Every structure is written in C-alpha cells, then in structure tokens.
C-alpha cells in the first residue's frame, strides 16, 4: 500500500494520545513516507517490483531506518514528510541478515530522531504503536502478540522476531514504538495466524537490538563488514518435517545446479534436515559465501547428491548511485 495515497487506519485501531506515556504526535512526526525506484534489470525487480513504497523512521540527523527490501538496488529514493515536503534520499546501506536498510536524506528534515529502545526487554502483551507516515490516522495501536523464531522462505532467519496485533495495513518500514516512546523494531511482513478458530493478520517486526552491532558498518560501508553468509538461491517451505523447494532464484547456485520446485532437501553435508531453521543453521555453519554446500536431494522418486557452489547474494545487486 503506497504511503502517498489517501487512506486511514480504522478509527478503532488508531492510537490515542492519552493511552501512552510519551508525546505520541511528536514521535510519529519522525516516521516518514518512503518511495523508491529500482531499475527494470535489477536482480530484485522481478520479486519486489521496480517501484516500492513504505515507511522509514528518523534515528539520527538525516538518517532514516527502514526495511531493506524497500531500497535494495534503488536508483532513486524520496522521503515524504508530514508537512508535505518531499526530500530526496540516498540508499545508504542494507543488512541482508537482519533485513534493515538505511537511507541518508539529501536535504534537511527538521525532525527529531526517535531514540532506540531495547527489543530484548519488550514483553508479550506490551502496549505498542506501529507507526506509519502520516501520524495517528496512519498508525496502529497494537500489542506484542509473540516473540519467537522466524524462518523466511528466502534463506532468512531471525532468532527472536516480534509479532504484533492488530496488524498495520502498510507495514513495510513502519516503526514499532514502545510505551516509552522508543523505537524497538521495524515492520517487515504481514502474516496470518489461527486464533480461537479464526484467521487473523499479524505483523512481523525486526527487533531493533539487531541494528545496534551493525549500525556503524552500515553507515560507513553500506553493508556489515564481515564475510557474507553462503547463499543458494532457493525458496523453501517446511512441510511435514520436510524441506521442499518451492522456487528457484535466477542466476543463483540452485538454478545452475538445475534444482527444481518440488525437490526435497534431505540432508546438508550428510546431516539429515527436518526443519527450515536447522537447514539454514547447517548451511551457514559450513563457512562464508563461496563455500561448497553438499546436498542430498529427492527428486521424483530419485535420491541424489549434488554440491552447490554458494555465493554472496549481494554481489548480484546493483549498487546505489549518489546523485
């Protein structure tokens, strides 16, 4: 959902100033709209599109924290402020492990940074606000519904993600604000869960504590200054204790090895795999990007061994250009 279109969160889900121990309007003013343009030939264009929109949160003078998929390979970024101004930005950095992205404003924002809180001390049941650009009418009064491991199908794993309910309809890059007015996470996804026999939406939020060890690297180098994890370029799902390939990324090692959707990953380097989290942890334990990854695969009645030469996924990305 674009941050620039006219819409409002249902009134019943909007935060009310008297319910929080901080200046709600002042903090929410530092959540900005974000709009990016990505080249048609970018690696991420097929999956994420060439025009992306969401939110970002001012965390330092001219520095905006967002979710990385909004700015990956962006050639142009604009920041939409609450007073109607539009300021150009520069995609400064992206951390593929956490999913965080940083944008540097190329003009004055005149907005106070939102202080960083602690996601570790946040507890299930805590009252929070998932803040979107546009103030209270585009923000959601939520609570922390769960803190638990999250495995994404795209070779992504969080040890302890935050899940909030009710869900924000424009969750990408939204700021999770604690009852102290501090930033404790950034919105990433909307998921469905079953509760009391009914299906309901929740947001998955990347916890802010994952930013603190990598923030300076992202500011200085645009990425975390350590060897990248090995990447195979396969999308998988955990189905009945089996890891099933549901898609293959073009140009990735899995594509070159001619793995197909429907294949089942039985083992990594001889270790039987029964969960997505186990699969990722075993894969990443083999070494940095470039390491050979021996897999045992089941394909249409045949079991075979294959070795994939892993790569650094970010090497496929177009680098940002400073205008």
Language-model region placement:
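Conserved active-site neighborhood of the chymotrypsin/trypsin-like protease fold
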Residues: 7-11, 39-41, 51-53, 58-139, ...
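Active-site region of chymotrypsin-like
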Residues: 106-114, 139-201, 230-232, 238, ...
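A short glycine-leucine-enriched loop at secondary-structure breakpoints
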Residues: 118-121, 174-175, 180, 247, ...
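Flexible, gly/ser-rich surface segments that form the specificity/activation loops bordering the active-site cleft
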Residues: 49, 70, 112-159, 192-199, ...
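Active-site-proximal beta-strands of protease catalytic cores
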Residues: 31-35, 64-68, 123-134, 164, ...
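Conserved PDZ fold ligand-binding element
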Residues: 60-65, 180, 184, 254-277
